[in-house]
Amino acid sequence: VDGTGWGLVCDGMGGANGGRVASTLATQTMLRYFDHSLRTIENGEEKAFMMRAFDNANRAVYEKATSDPEVLGMGTTGVCALQRGNLAHIVHAGDSRAYLWHGGAIRQLTRDHSMVQQLVDSGQITREQAALHPQKNLITRALGVSANIVPEYNRCEVVPGDLLLLCTDGLTNMVPDAELALLLQESAFFDAPGVLVDRALKGGGQD
């Protein structure tokens, strides 16, 4: 679609096999939906379109998780960005994040759906304490864990030169936001994903 781009990141949970099945199934379901339907939507329909994509993926993962004992209880996070013109539309569930890099600075566009984020929101702990909290990986929303899902939507303006970063907690647990901004600024566009992954792995990341 002219002037349109989109991206998706899913991070599975429920054991090595279940997590892989959940994230793959969610990704494939949304890929088919975008390929089939993206060209048909009008301006202003982006939110509803993306919500349907998440609903379809949630249903696919949930039906598999409840019908196959080998992957019982599996689920996956999801964060999706759809850029059309000067607007980026973001939908997410879980703690995979979207960031906007603009003019050398980085801004988190999503709010983690996690127990620890709820503690931060209520003022019980600080963001610095959250980064070290032993339960920081307990999420409160994910694809496939219940029959219905209410993902979160937001949007922001973008201009030429901006970058949208979609990533899992495998990156954000290892690399602080300030360093993410610096790495994006210093890396060529097509080199950036590899640079970020290498940095996370060197920091002890497992994803």
Predicted stretch roles:
Residues 1-207:
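PP2C/PPM-type serine/threonine phosphatase catalytic domain
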